[in-house]
A protein has these predicted regions:
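Cys-dependent protein tyrosine phosphatase-like superfamily
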Residues: 1-91, 103-147
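A short, basic/flexible loop-to-alpha-helix module at the beginning of a structural domain
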Residues: 143-158
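Short cysteine clusters
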Residues: 95
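N-terminal Rossmann-like FAD-binding beta1-loop-alpha1 element of flavoenzymes
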Residues: 157-186
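Catalytic nucleophile loop
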Residues: 101-102, 169
Length: 186
C-alpha cells in the first residue's frame, strides 16, 4: 500500500482500503487506522467490522468514525481530534477518496494552525479544501481555547438561494451575478 498521502509526521490519508492491505499498512509503520466511511456507502466497500478484524489481526488499532460526505459536524471534528490524541504512532485515516479524512484533519488542526498552511498542505497531497476555507478561518480566529459545539454543523451558506432551476431561475441568477459577481448563489 503506497497510495497514501502524508499530511503530518503522524498522519497520512488514503482512499478506500481493503482488508488484505492492512498487514502491509502495519509493515509500513502505521499503528492506527481510522475509517471515516459510513458502512454501506458504496458497493465496493468492505464493512467496518471486516476491516476491524483484519486490522486487529495485523496488530493495528482500529477506529470507525463515520462521516457523511459534506456534513462534517463539530462532533466529528472533536471525535477525530480525540482519536489523534489517543493514538500511538503514525495514523492512517481513510474514506472513499481521502478528502473527508483530510478535511477532518484540517478542521481539527485549524484552531492552532493557519488555514493557508492547512490548505496548502492538503493541496500538495492532492486534496482541495477550498470549500472548507471559511470554516477553517472561523476556527482559526476563535483560537485554541475555543471548543467546537457538539451537534453543531457549520453548513455551507449562500448569499442567495434560487428556488426553481428552470429558465427563470437561471436568468435571475445570471442577472444577480452580473450586478454583483462576488455573490454566492445556490
Amino acid at each position: 500500500m503506497s497510495d497514501y498521502k502524508r499530511l503530518s509526521p503522524n498522519l497520512a490519508v488514503a482512499g478506500q482500503i481493503q482488508p488484505g492491505q492492512l498487514e502491509d499498512i502495519a509493515r509500513q509503520g502505521f499503528h492506527t487506522v481510522i475509517n471515516n466511511r459510513p458502512d454501506n456507502e458504496g458497493d465496493d466497500q468492505p464493512s467496518s467490522e471486516t476491516l476491524e478484524q483484519a486490522a486487529r489481526a495485523a496488530g493495528l488499532a482500529y477506529y470507525h468514525l463515520p462521516v457523511t460526505p459534506g456534513e462534517i459536524s463539530d462532533t466529528d471534528i472533536l471525535g477525530f481530534a480525540g482519536l489523534m490524541q489517543q493514538s500511538r504512532g503514525p495514523v492512517l485515516a481513510f474514506c472513499r477518496t481521502g478528502n473527508r479524512s483530510s478535511s477532518l484533519w484540517a478542521l481539527s488542526e485549524s484552531a492552532r494552525t493557519d488555514p493557508k498552511t492547512l490548505i496548502a498542505t492538503a493541496d500538495q497531497a492532492g486534496y482541495d479544501l477550498s470549500k472548507q476555507e471559511a470554516r477553517l478561518q472561523q476556527r482559526w480566529r476563535a483560537g485554541p481555547g475555543a471548543q467546537p459545539q457538539p451537534g453543531h454543523s457549520a453548513a455551507t451558506t449562500w448569499d442567495v438561494l434560487v428556488v426553481g432551476g428552470g429558465a427563470g431561475g437561471l436568468a435571475a441568477a445570471a442577472s444577480l451575478l452580473k450586478r454583483r459577481p462576488s455573490l454566492s448563489i445556490a
